[in-house]
Amino acid sequence: MELLLTLGCLGLAAVMLYPGSKMLQRQYYRQQLRYTAYLLAADIRQMQQQTLFQPENYTYTLKVSDKDKHSYRIERAHKIWKRVRLDADISLTCEKEIKNLSYNENGNPTAIGGYRLEHRQLPDMYCQLTVQPVTGRVSVYER
C-alpha cells in the first residue's frame, strides 16, 4: 500500500513538473542565445578599443565564414588572434558587407551592417547585432 502511494505521489509530481521543464528549457536556450550575442558584441568592442589604444597599430579584423555558421575569428595583422566556436544549436549569419569587419585608427568601422544569431530550438526568436556607421557603436537587439 505504501509503495502504491509513493508511486502515485511521484507520478503526480512528475506530471506537474513536466510543463515547467519545457519552460525552463526555453529560458535556458534564451539565455544561451543572449550570452552568445553579448560575447560577440564584447569582442567587437574590444577590437575597436585595441585598434584605438594599442601603440603597435595592428589591424584587427572580425571574419565570419559562409561555410561554418557556428564560429567566427578575429585576426591581428592577418594572423588568428582569437577563434570562437559557438554552440552547435546557435548559428551566426551576417550581411555580405560586414563579413570582414575592422576599425581604422580613429575607431571608425570599415564596414557597417548587422549580425544575426539564431537558436535552433527557438525558431521565433533571434538576436540582432548592428554596427553603427562613423562611431562603430555595437547594439544588441532581441526579437
Describe the role of every protein-language-model region.
Residues 16-38, 42, 46-49, 53, ...:
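N-terminal helix-rich module
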Residues 1-24:
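N-terminal single-pass transmembrane signal-anchor helix
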